[in-house]
């Protein structure tokens, strides 16, 4: 893997009210090549005006040197069509646990994905599934079991460092499990913090999204795994923090931290010393 072969994107969910031109300036100014856009109600692209609203936004982003690398959205026909029109390759979704329970979820999910494959073929746009804790397929191992029966040109994987970490699944195992279908690598981090106690004295835990260096996810191990596997796709900084104070600084700090880890991994793989250590 070479960092120059990576497309660096940022999920822009925290900035729903920023005009698209200002959003483009923000993302480009932080050193990213692309964005993941939340194609949902309440954001800069009007769903009622697709595909024209997506084309307008894409044009503004292109002028700033950016592209839309993926969208987080519901894969409806209008969304597929808009993505195809402006060259957005991936629609990211999660896979919920069925109302009938976990045992029923596999069949229900496969029927849903089967229904999406014709649109993937028609529009040339992939659907990427991201694991998510709680009421969804929660980790990469569960996801790999589903994806094994699908062509990665249609249904692909979005690896997520935080949600695998919350499920206590290490990157050295989860990334290879998804490798054949891997389209996007999400970096954010999280941990569990005590939120109080119940009347019976037992602890209550909550999820906290924190800095890349502070969570359960081992970003260094993830960097090593990506480098060893010569990954060359999209890496997305998810910009998700429970405390959004000084958010732009936090994203920039995590971006720099990840870049340093990848540089160290590349140097290790090449049998050399990271540039920062050579100049120290």
Model-derived regions, located:
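Active-site beta-loop-alpha junctions enriched in small/polar residues
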Residues: 11-15, 38-42, 73-76, 96-98, ...
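C-terminal/domain-terminus segments
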Residues: 237-258
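Hydrophobic faces of well-ordered beta-strands that scaffold small-molecule active sites
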Residues: 6-12, 35-37, 68-73, 91-93, ...
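Active-site acidic/histidine proton-transfer and metal-coordination neighborhood
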Residues: 21-22, 29, 63, 67-157, ...
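Charged helix-capping and loop-helix junction motifs
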Residues: 49-56, 105-114, 140-145, 169-176, ...
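N-terminal pre-domain/capping segments
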Residues: 1-90, 180, 255-280
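Acidic/histidine-rich catalytic cores of soluble enzymes
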Residues: 118-216, 223, 266-272, 277
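Glycine/Thr-rich phosphate-binding loops of Rossmann-like dinucleotide-binding domains
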Residues: 45, 101, 195, 245
């Amino acid at each position: 893997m070479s960092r120059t072969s990576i497309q660096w994107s940022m999920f822009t969910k925290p900035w729903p009210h920023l005009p698209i031109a200002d959003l483009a300036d923000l993302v480009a100014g932080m050193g990213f090549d692309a964005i993941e856009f939340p194609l949902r109600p309440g954001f800069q692209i009007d769903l009622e005006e697709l595909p024209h609203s997506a084309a307008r936004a894409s044009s503004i982003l292109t002028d700033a040197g950016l592209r839309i690398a993926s969208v987080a959205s519901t894969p409806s026909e209008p969304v597929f069509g808009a993505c195809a029109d402006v060259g957005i390759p991936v629609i990211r979704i999660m896979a919920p646990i069925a109302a009938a329970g976990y045992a029923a979820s596999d069949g229900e999910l496969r029927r849903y994905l089967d229904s999406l494959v014709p649109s993937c073929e028609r529009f040339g746009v992939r659907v990427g599934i991201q694991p998510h804790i709680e009421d969804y397929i929660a980790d990469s191992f569960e996801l790999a079991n589903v994806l094994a029966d699908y062509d990665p040109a249609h249904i692909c994987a979005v690896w997520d460092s935080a949600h695998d970490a919350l499920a206590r699944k290490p990157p050295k195992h989860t990334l290879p499990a998804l490798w054949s279908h891997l389209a996007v690598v999400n970096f954010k981090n999280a941990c569990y913090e005590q939120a109080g106690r119940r009347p019976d004295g037992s602890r209550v835990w909550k999820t906290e999204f924190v800095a890349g260096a502070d969570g359960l996810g081992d970003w260094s191990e993830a960097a090593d795994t990506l480098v060893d596997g010569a990954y060359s796709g999209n890496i997305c900084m998810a910009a998700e923090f429970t405390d959004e104070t000084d958010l732009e600084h936090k994203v920039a700090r995590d971006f720099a931290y990840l870049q340093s880890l990848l540089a160290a991994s590349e140097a290790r793989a090449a049998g050399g010393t990271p540039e920062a250590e050579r100049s120290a």
